[in-house]
Amino acid sequence: MKQYYMQQLETYFDDDGKSTGFKTIFDQLMITGMQALLKDPNSATAKSQFVGYAGALTEYFNGMAGNLEKVQKDINQEIKLKVDQINSLAGEIASLNKQINTIELAGTKANELRDRRTLLIDELSKIVDVEVKETPIIDANNENRETGANRYMVKIAGGQMLVDGSDYNGLECVARTSYEKVNQTDIDGLYEVYWADGQKFNLYNASMGGDLAGLIQMRDGNNGENFTGQVTATGTTTTADGKTHDTVTVKVTKAYLQDLNKCNLSDQGGIIDLGNQEFYYDSWEYTCEYDANGNATYTYTFTLSDSEKNPRGITNDRVGKKAEIGTDLSYQGIPYYMNQMNEWIRTFSQKFNDILTSGYSGSGDPGVKMFTGNKATSSEQFLLDDAAKRYDKQEKKNSKVTVKVNDDSYYRLTAKNFDILDAMEQDPSLMANRKNASDGVEQNDLLNDLKNLATDKSKMSFRGCNASEFLQCILSDVALNASRANTFYASFKDISATIDNQRISISGVDEDEEAVNLVKYQNGYNLASKMIQTLTAIYD
């Protein structure tokens, strides 16, 4: 499973000259387009061309987000198919158990049915890790007598009972609602799996195994970067509708949670686990606070949903408990690659826009932003103009910045909604090219700063690389995961072949051996026939 989907990701991210990828598009913007601008900074044609190249960059990320969403959707559907297969196989195994016991109670061995059941177990073990146990059923009136029937049990994913004799426990896929999303970039309707009795089936069980484990890791893999922290306070707040809601504040220490550009928390609400108790939340806000010594504290405050979703209100005994959203999955799946794109987009857009807005256009007007994002619920775009929300620019002593999930912060930018500011697209002359309004229109000092943004790590750094090396970082991840998947597949194939050969050596048919036996039996038959003919002649 991983092998197939990692090959897809390699194809999507590839930039081999046959397909236009990130490097080609980024070089058009920061080399081809920039060189034309540097030669003629106030040229309407050069600015229009540059904005066009910038638009191609946003469209590239839009397309990549769409491709990865499609892969996640395909994986999600395949998970449902695998769950349906498990149910079908469980039903067949339970039915065979009943038939086998019916026959064997009469003293006859049901070899053919047992072989069929073994094949079903083999098929099930490809989907999920399987444990089988068969025990004889003892006569209730005589503990020394076996009835001839057996109790055949099948457990999956680390000991969870699937089949017990002629009964089986079915599984059901239930789509997450929009307010149950784990990641900001997740598509709607990702499946959770439940037992027929309503108990949740743990999809993230370390003993899952099989195709199902691979699919879950590809769909939900976050490189171990889920939300986690410690509850420091509980309280209440009054929302815009006048209702009072519980709140919980969580201190975070992970670097990827302290930087909002790396944040992948859902912006539509979700489920947070507080000391092994789950609560729905509607929104959150991020706070970065520096004390007098320059020590920073990072917290997230979640506004919990009403009592309809949270019939059990939060209590102060949650303070000090671990808070967690989602699951720590070390594999680099779709959420990981989506978040990598988001981080690069947010960081690059911040740096690029900051340079533009610090200068002036050819007409002497203050520079405007180039990159923004489109709001999902309207035709409007994010403004990204509230300096008070820029935690990356706050004073490093005695300062506090709070960013709410719905603020127009750079957190709102994603690969899916990334776009050019409408005003800039309609009038490229708004693009700044000089640092001082008093300089001549041919001044290009600000453009040089933009040019350096592509290659100077001190201007922008992404995973220790410069802005232009984004694709190398991603492709190295994809290539490594693809290589591991290929190696695992080859090893599994070899082990499977070895097991099949062992089975064949015991239960299979050797054609040469059968041919020798056939000749031997034929010769024996011929000799016996001649002996009978001879004895018959003597008696006659």
Which residue stretches match the model-derived regions?
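Structural signature of extracellular appendage/secretion-system components
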Residues: 1-540
